[in-house]
Every structure is written in structure tokens, then in C-alpha cells.
Amino acid sequence: MKKGIYLSLICIVSLQASEKLEDITLNEQAPTNTKVVKNVSGEEVKSADLADALNRKIPSISLIRRSGIANDITLRGQKRDNINITIDGAKICGACVNRMDPPTSHVVTHAIDDIEIKEGPFDVEEFGTLSGSVKVTTKKPTKKISGEMSLNGGSFGYKKASGTISGGTDKVRLLLSASTEQGEQYEDGNGDNFSEQLANYTKGNPDTAKFNYAQNHKDMDAFTKTMYMGKVFVDITDDQELKLSYTANRSDDILYPSSKMDAEYDDSDMMNLKYSVKNLSSFSKKLEMQVYQSEVDHPMSTKYRALAKKGGKYMTHHLTTDMRGAKLKNSADAFGADISYGVDTSKRNWDGKYTVTTIDGSKPIKTIGKSIADVDTDNIGIFFKGKKSFGALDIEGGLRYDDTTIDTASNQEKDTDFTSSSASLFATYKADKDTKLFAGIGKSNRVPDARELYNVKYNTKEKPAKRVINGNPSLNQTTNYELDVGVEKYFPNGQLKFKTFYSKLKDYIYYNGSLKKNNFENIDANIYGLELSGTYLATDAIYLDAGLAYKKGRKDTLTTGQSDRDLADISPLKLHASVTYDYDMQGNVQLSFVAVDKWSDIDAQNGEQELAGYGVVNLKTSREFDNGLTLLFGVDNLLDKTYTTTNTYKDLILMTDSSDTMLINEPGRYVYLNATYMF
């Protein structure tokens, strides 16, 4: 149980292991600026939503609430493509221009083994890492026949069933995993569900009231989601391994009350193949090759809204995207250092169009026009990184060069291309056996995506519909110059870590909601902040854990026609704290607390609003039995608070008017029970 985790904290003091969350694992080689989240598929997470899980575990990550599932994250005040997210080394992108299907939504927590979060521009292996990277590793097949079955039920009609089985031989190992879940519209602390929150927002405003849910849809479920994953690992020889995997995600009828459309479905398919060979020569300790492909199909529409029923027709925005990539990487020992170098390439296609469909089928589907016109983003990059120790000093460094071309099928916008170089240096000094000092400096880049460059909206009040380009084909790529500094201290019964960062953003891509067209602009900006985290083993049975994050963001240059210098998405001071009590070797109780300060530094001209601070208490208890059964009971938001974590949506729903954006409240008191049987 947890006691083994607590005792390992004592070992950390002498072994100088890296920071771990949940299932603490000793790892001297992990860099100090890396966090690893373990046990994501276990007792810590009660739904498939990875974004919610990360928000609960990492103080520097905040949740962007959009729905009951498929939510998004910010990392150190940045979001969207500024965060590089990979799943088993493969990159998947959402198809929705409104971020209804962010990368975190295409992997479910049930399938995850661990997650590595690296903050800052220190990952040269990946294309476009600006504020940090999130690397998800899914479960691996085992030789021994093993598996688990899990049933979960909770408030607001939540139901989930999942299962995994694995086994094989000395040469071949297989894994099959599946899950299905559904949930009703959750209620906030006031007792209002999605439909009621939306009706409260639109009350007295006929221009927005037409986007309320229709009478026959106002009580529909918030989502259903199914996942299938299969893996085959083959040891060709003692030094050669082949890994194949396929994952399918199928989500249906996902409600997004703060947007004008809901997702009819969201389907994704990911295929991944890896081959590695060890000890090829003195120049190759390990050679790794990978090819992958991901596809996403995402139609969203006004089908469930009042204006569809009244007008007898609904609008659909159907988008697709696919990502193909390959990487070749070689690792070697040279000059007393661990080095690796390689090349990677990727091609993303993004396409979308608007159509109108009559509910009774009396007329053929009418195409209004393209939103994204078959845009290809091709990238090739080369990278080099190395790690070397000089006594008590460990140095890591990396270099990367990228060449990117972006081609659109539209004859009204121009193609574009970018080249960039990235570099980073990170040093860790062991001042004594209990103290680490660390500092890093880095530069990274990310190119604008097809939405930011070329996205088109249509004014359907005019006949024919008027084409308005929401994107900006003249955007430059963004460059991040960042400095990170910190200290980590170990004590006989615990650990304390402090770090601070300063990020200088040149040509930061920012949404200006005041403009009638070309809403994305380049500005210069800066973000700085600090993080404090610690663990303490009070007794053999009581364990305390806490983390705090603060950041501030300012515009160095202003957006066109605006005067507010506060950056959007800079969430306020956030505190996580928990105390866990092991009442015996097979059971524990945990009380946790999340507190967030008032959100007062806002970009009001782009839809942000002042939000009250809040404090939320969560309680859970788990019990393991000798027969392989584990029961987990919990209550989130124990005091049934009404609160909001997410501020602006104006850039997510592409609004270009002066109206306020609707804010979605978080769930009220949520009671859940999970039963897992492992064999």
C-alpha cells in the first residue's frame, strides 16, 4: 500500500531521486525539471479526463473547463500548441478549431502508465515545445498473464466499466484494453446543470437565447465515450524489439454549453510502430526508429439548440485532421557523456467546412464554404542532446533545427514557411548529499497552426454568406527565451523544492477579440512565476503533501486597438495540499484541499472576467483485499461549493463582438465508488 511509498521518501534523501507524484519511484537519471505522474489509471482518477487529472496533481497546470469530459489544460499560463503533447512518442492533434478535442482527450486515464511533464523550453527532441511538454506513456504488455476489471459509478449519472488483459511468452507479449463511460450533465453547487447554466446566462437576451438547448434535448446526457487499445511487443533477438499499437477513441454527443455548437461525435485512431536495436557498435548504444499516424474526425453542430428546432435546420462545422510522423534517434557514449541525436519529420493535414442540414431531410445538405482549406503543415527537424557529469555538477544541453512549410489549398491566402533554431542548457549542482541547486536557460520556437493562419468564418445573415477570415496569414512564429532557477532540499522525513522562471515571448500569438477579421496577432510578452512543493512523513502512517504555484503575465506590446496589458489565461495563486492516513497496511484515508486566489489580473478586453477565489475540500478512502479486490470511495467538493476555474473562452469560440463569455461552473458535490479486481 502507500506505506511503501512513504518509506521510499527516506531513501530519496540519500539516493537523490527525481521528484515523483503518487507512486514514488527512485530514478537518479531523471532531470530536476521533470515531474512524473504515476498511477493515473489507479485510484487517483475517477473519469477518463486526463486534463482533470493533471489539474489535480500539478499546481502549475490549470484546467480549461469546456464540458463534462474532453477538457484542456494550460501550463505556466500557456495553452494550445504552446504545449507539446505526445502519446507513446506520437503526436496527435485535435480537429476542432474551438479545442473541443484537445490532444489530452484522445487518451483515457484507464490506459495510462505514467506522464512526464517537463516545464520550459528544454525538450529539443520534439517540434514546437514552447512552454513545456507532456509525454504520456500508456500501459505495456507483460509476459505473465495478468489483468484488471473495474466498475465505477458516481453522481450525475456517471457510469464507467473498463478492463485490461495482458500476457505472452519470452518472445511475444500482448495487451488488450477497453473502457466505456457515460455521464449526465453535472450540476454545480447551485444545483444547475449545463442546460440551466446556459439558460441563466442567456436570460433576457434574445440574440443568445436561441442557443439554449431545445426542449427535447435539454436533459440529454453530457457525453458517452469508448476506448479500445491493443499492443504487441516482440523481442526479435536479445537486442532487438518491435512494438506495435493501435488505439481507437469513440465519443458521442458531447455537450459544450459555452459554445454555440456541440460535438455530434469525436472519433480518433492512432497507429504506432517502434523498432529498437541495442549495441550495434561502439557508436550506437541504442538505435530507435518510430513511425506513427493519427486521424481525428470531428463534426460539431447546432442540432441540439433551440434555433435548430425553430428554424427546422441546423449548421454543422465538420473538421478532420491527420498527423503522420517518423523519427530516427541514435544514442551513444562519447567523451564521457551520454549523447543522442536524430531526425524527425511530420506532416499534418487539417480540413473543414460548414454545411446546413434540414431536420426533416426535405432539402439536400447545403455547403456554405470551407473553414480550413485542406492545409498541410510539413516539418523536418534535426536534434542533438547530451548529458555529462563533472563531479557534483550535472550538465544537460541540446540543440535543434527545424524547417517548416505550410501550404493551403485556398487560392485567396498565401502559403508560408519557417526555419528556426532551438537550444537549451540545464545544470544541477549537488551542494551536499541533501541539497541540489539547479538552473536552466533555453530558447524554443513554435509555428502558427492552420487555424491561426487561415481559419474562415461566414456571415450567414448576408446572401450569399460573406466570407470573413478569422486567421492571419501574416503571422510570425513565436520564440520563447526562458530562465529557470531553483533549489531542492531533502530532510530525514521529507523534501522541499522551490523554483522560479522568467519567460520572454517574442511574436507571441494572441487572440484579439476586438477586430472584425484577422483576429490573431503577434505581440511581445513576458510570463514569470514561482513554484513551491514539499512532502513530509509525519509518522509511519501519516503523510503530507503540498504544492503552490504563482505566475504573472504582461504584454510588452499591445494588441491592435486595445490598452489592457494583462495576459489572458494567467490563472492566480493556486495551492494543493493533502494529508493521507494509513490506518493499516491495506487501507487509507486522504483529505485534500485546493485553494485558488481571486482572479483579478484579467484581459477584460478579450472576454476575461474577475473571478472569486475558492477553496474546495475532497475526501476519499480506499481498501485493498487479499483476493485482489480494491474498493475506493470518495467525495469531491465535499462542501458543495459553487466556483469557476476557467476564465475566457473568447479565443476558443472565435467571438469577435463585445459580449461577455459564458463561464461554466465546476461540479458540485460529487460522490463516487470504484471497484477494481486485479489478477
Feature-to-residue mapping (PLM):
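Short acidic/polar hinge/loop motifs at secondary-structure boundaries
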Residues: S62-L63, K91-E119
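Transmembrane beta-barrel wall of Gram-negative outer-membrane proteins
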Residues: S155-Q182, N193-D252, D267-L273, V277-K278, ...
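N-terminal periplasmic "start-of-domain" segments of outer-membrane beta-barrel proteins
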Residues: L21-L50, D72, R80-I83, I115
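Gram-negative outer-membrane beta-barrel transporters
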Residues: K388-I395, T404, Q495, T500-L505, ...
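Flexible loop and strand-edge segments within Gram-negative outer membrane beta-barrel domains
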Residues: K225, D239-K286, E295-T321
